[in-house]
Amino acid sequence: MTNIRKTHPLTKIINNSFIDLPAPSNISAWWNFGSLLGICLIIQILTGLFLAMHYTSDTATAFSSVTHICRDVNYGWIIRYMHANGASMFFVCLFLHVGRGLYYGSYMFPETWNIGIILLFAVMATAFMGYVLPWGQMSFWGATVITNLLSAIPYIGTDLVEWIWGGFSVDKATLTRFFAFHFILPFIISALAAVHLLFLHETGSNNPSGIPSDSDKIPFHPYYTIKDILGALFLILTLMLLVLFSPDLLGDPDNYIPANPLNTPPHIKPEWYFLFAYAILRSIPNKLGGVLALVLSILVLAIIPLLHTSKQRSMMFRPLSQCLFWLLVADLLTLTWIGGQPVEYPFITIGQLASILYFMILLVLMPIASIIENNLLKW
């Protein structure tokens, strides 16, 4: 008799996705981040659900309700800080996951890659709206500055911003709708992640060499289940170290001051994971130009598959491309640092140079390096 695991309509899907799935025998720890992102999403949904039970999305009580969660709710402080720092862990995993895709040529699965870009935008939108909810100074002014960017859109900009605000400034209506969107988006992200996996399983996983691995596959369970559990333990260990020892390390002290529309903080800046994009936005003196550069800094990922000029898929055997890749990583770290600095000399110039280099590497230097490497193969 056939195992129920392989015949029952529900368990069959789980079996084919996580148990009997044929996986390449040589995928490294860089392939762990997909499962880690899934775990991050589950942690965020669960902690978020418990926070939503005690949170009130009203300008008069939002700040107090978060304080109440931390002081009066049983283990409310740990739930709140797991949610806040869980977002940081989520973005660490996201950036490493995208970086892996760039390095090993995983973008050659166009459907999986494009759904991934949509997922990235969705997670960024969710994180932004979540940052507004505690209704501290940085919440309020961050919401004001970022939503105001839409006013740069010609003709409809101002109307669009006022429509999103639900009034003439960030106020009660804005907070309520941001809470509604922040609650629903993670479930949309879950559905998109399922589609992401669906497309991935149509082709099977890529591997570090970039060479088809059909001739050498191993079952996902137990080999990669145990590997994923090890990764999950590292993730949870790091998260709990952050939560229990320095929960405010990545936050902004200004967010412990209740939102005040009459008092602007000296330096308005987003959470650390948006700083690279914020630096690109600020490096262009024109408002519309800055907004376009901001969107393109992520959207540029969509044209990476079209710019793949190399005869090899992975960067494993391409030293020139490797150098450019790590230069890109250094450039993104520089942009992240600049995003948190005040708008003054020399930071403005460094930010502009780093922004130009970011787009230069991805759009010009990488394709050229690939062509050079193709010619070196003939030697």
From Swiss-Prot:
Membrane topology listed for this record: Multi-pass membrane protein
Sequence intervals crossing the membrane: 33-53, 77-98, 113-133, 178-198, 226-246, 288-308, 320-340, 347-367
Gene3D superfamilies per record: Cytochrome Bc1 Complex, Chain C
Principal place of residence: mitochondrion
InterPro entries for the chain: Cyt_b/b6_C, Cyt_b/b6_C_sf, Cyt_b/b6_N, Cytb/b6-like_sf, Cytochrome_b, Cytochrome_b_C_euk/bac, Cytochrome_b_N_euk/bac, Di-haem_cyt_TM
Cofactor: binding comment: Binds 2 heme b groups non-covalently.
Amino acids binding a ubiquinone: H201
Alphabetically ordered keywords of this record: Electron transport, Heme, Iron, Membrane, Metal-binding, Mitochondrion, Mitochondrion inner membrane, Respiratory chain, Transmembrane, Transmembrane helix, Transport, Ubiquinone
Name of a matching Pfam family: Cytochrome_B
Chain positions recorded as heme b b562 binding sites: H83, H182
Assembly and binders: The cytochrome bc1 complex contains 11 subunits: 3 respiratory subunits (MT-CYB, CYC1 and UQCRFS1), 2 core proteins (UQCRC1 and UQCRC2) and 6 low-molecular weight proteins (UQCRH/QCR6, UQCRB/QCR7, UQCRQ/QCR8, UQCR10/QCR9, UQCR11/QCR10 and a cleavage product of UQCRFS1). This cytochrome bc1 complex then forms a dimer.
Recorded family membership: Belongs to the cytochrome b family.
Task of the protein: Component of the ubiquinol-cytochrome c reductase complex (complex III or cytochrome b-c1 complex) that is part of the mitochondrial respiratory chain. The b-c1 complex mediates electron transfer from ubiquinol to cytochrome c. Contributes to the generation of a proton gradient across the mitochondrial membrane that is then used for ATP synthesis.
Other known facts: Heme 1 (or BL or b562) is low-potential and absorbs at about 562 nm, and heme 2 (or BH or b566) is high-potential and absorbs at about 566 nm.
Listed name of the protein: Cytochrome b
Organism the protein comes from: Mustela frenata (Long-tailed weasel)
Taxonomic placement: Eukaryota, Metazoa, Chordata, Craniata, Vertebrata
